[in-house]
């Protein structure tokens, strides 16, 4: 689920460039404006290799592979961008659809560490529309790594160019795919609520 909750933390930091240590490694972040509301994040390189994701079975790239979820067959592409994602391309991209399918994808035996799901529609060569089911959290209106995973899968399949706008209920994120495979995510942060955090949280 949340090994790489980068966008949630960025609104608290005002340095121009900085690193964030996550459960999946060090993430390099650049603040793009003086108000600290827009950030560019180096997510690293995705892997479609089953043992990296992980997906059970022989070691292979999990590209447009047939899976059965809740008695129905789907073609899915799976990858990791620091956490595991299953991408299903469909014309029916709705909250209801991902809520109905998400629990079955998350908990299938073929995904030993459970799985995040994005159902995705190619709008054109530069735009995708997604809905998100996050393992351990359920329906989610926005996900940075989910957007990166959907864009990387679409790019791998030749559906999009190297710059992709990923549209989700919580807003749009711009994804840039570099020639060496590195993913850059550019997005904004906004005020949601005031919270209190114990000092021990940071120790």
Regions inferred by a protein language model and the residue ranges of each:
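Short, small-residue-biased leader/transition segments that mark boundaries at the very start
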Residues: 1-6
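Active-site proximal loop and beta-alpha junction motif in alpha/beta enzyme cores
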Residues: 7-141, 152-203
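Helical hairpin unit composed of two closely spaced alpha helices linked by a short loop
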Residues: 145-147
């Amino acid at each position: 689920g949340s090994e790489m909750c980068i966008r949630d933390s960025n609104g608290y930091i005002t340095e121009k460039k900085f690193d964030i240590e996550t459960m999946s490694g060090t993430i390099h972040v650049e603040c793009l404006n003086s108000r600290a509301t827009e950030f560019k994040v180096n997510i690293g390189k995705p892997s479609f290799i089953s043992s990296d994701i992980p997906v059970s079975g022989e070691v292979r790239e999990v590209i447009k592979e047939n899976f059965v979820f809740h008695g129905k067959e789907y073609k899915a592409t799976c990858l990791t961008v620091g956490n595991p994602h299953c991408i299903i391309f469909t014309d029916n991209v709705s909250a209801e659809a991902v809520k109905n399918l998400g629990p079955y994808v998350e908990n299938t035996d073929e995904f030993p560490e459970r799985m995040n799901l994005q159902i995705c529609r190619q709008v054109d060569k530069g735009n995708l529309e997604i809905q998100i089911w996050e393992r351990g959290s359920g329906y989610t209106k926005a996900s940075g790594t989910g957007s990166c995973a959907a864009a990387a899968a679409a790019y791998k399949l030749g559906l999009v160019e190297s710059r992709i706008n990923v549209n989700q209920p919580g807003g749009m994120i711009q994804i840039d795919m570099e020639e060496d495979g590195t993913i850059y995510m550019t997005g904004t942060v906004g005020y949601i609520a005031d919270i209190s955090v114990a000092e021990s949280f940071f120790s």
